């Protein structure tokens, strides 16, 4: 039983290896790119709309609404980044319905990379919205003594974001595999559905936390400057 897709090696040459994490990450990206191209190539504003376009509009509007609820900010500027995170993690977890597939989210390297993207996005959005001086100033609030603690807080929440997603996906996959091996005649369908549900929930939790982290740096300064957006 493989706990993480990192341990499944398909090809190796010296220190370079091609493992399941890399293969299935590219598979998920390929599916998302092709799916996006197929759905958006014939978009229309006149009815009747295709079922795929209706489904896409529902998904985009739901993501936009969740961004507004979580951040109390206008959603459009965050939609490409937050939407991509959600769709990638969700698709990566939903494909576990296929027996040979291993979710890349079950690898700590994948979740660390996703958390690192959030870590970089936080100052980018913060500086873009409140300016570099106002953004950097929040690291010394309420006093300059808090600078190291605020920096540690930034790093620790990024680490927790990566470990939370990795731990939940890995533990769920392990639990499903154990139960299926114990009672293979009764639990496979139920446990597979349970794994899919947990995967979608974890994608939702990860993206909402990412949005909250991004909004937090902006809100701190907007409250000070009186430019808070409703």
Swiss-Prot record:
Key component of the proton channel; it plays a direct role in the translocation of protons across the membrane. HAMAP family: ATP_synth_a_bact. It is a multi-pass membrane protein. This is ATP synthase subunit a 1. GO terms for molecular function: proton-transporting ATP synthase activity, rotational mechanism. GO terms for cellular component: plasma membrane-derived thylakoid membrane; proton-transporting ATP synthase complex. GO terms for biological process: proton motive force-driven plasma membrane ATP synthesis. Pfam families: ATP-synt_A. It comes from Crocosphaera subtropica (strain ATCC 51142 / BH68). F-type ATPases have 2 components, CF(1) - the catalytic core - and CF(0) - the membrane proton channel. CF(1) has five subunits: alpha(3), beta(3), gamma(1), delta(1), epsilon(1). CF(0) has four main subunits: a, b, b' and c. The chain crosses the membrane at residues 20-40, 78-98, 112-132, 174-194, 195-215. Belongs to the ATPase A chain family. PROSITE patterns: ATPASE_A. It is found in: Cellular thylakoid membrane. Keywords: ATP synthesis, CF(0), Hydrogen ion transport, Ion transport, Membrane, Thylakoid, Transmembrane, Transmembrane helix, Transport.
């Amino acid at each position: 039983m493989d706990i993480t897709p990192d341990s499944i090696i398909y090809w190796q040459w010296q220190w370079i290896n091609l493992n399941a994490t890399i293969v299935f990450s590219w598979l998920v990206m390929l599916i998302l790119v092709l799916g996006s191209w197929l759905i958006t190539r014939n978009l229309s504003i006149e009815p009747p709309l295709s079922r795929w376009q209706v489904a896409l509009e529902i998904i985009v509007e739901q993501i936009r609404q969740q961004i507004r609820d979580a951040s109390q900010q206008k959603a459009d500027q965050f939609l490409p980044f937050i939407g991509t995170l959600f769709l990638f993690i969700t698709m990566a977890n939903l494909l576990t319905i296929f027996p040979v597939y291993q979710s890349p989210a079950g690898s700590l390297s994948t979740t660390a990379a996703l958390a690192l993207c959030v870590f970089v996005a936080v100052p980018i959005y913060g500086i873009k919205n409140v300016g570099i001086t106002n953004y950097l100033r929040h690291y010394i609030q309420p006093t300059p003594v808090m600078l190291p603690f605020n920096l540690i807080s930034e790093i620790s929440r990024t680490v927790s974001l990566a470990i939370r997603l990795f731990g939940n996906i890995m533990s769920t996959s392990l639990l499903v595999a154990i139960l299926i091996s114990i009672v293979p005649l009764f639990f496979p369908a139920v446990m597979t559905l349970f794994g899919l549900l947990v995967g979608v929930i974890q994608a939702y939790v990860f993206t909402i936390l990412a949005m909250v982290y991004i909004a937090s740096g902006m809100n701190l300064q907007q409250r000070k400057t009186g430019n808070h957006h409703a």
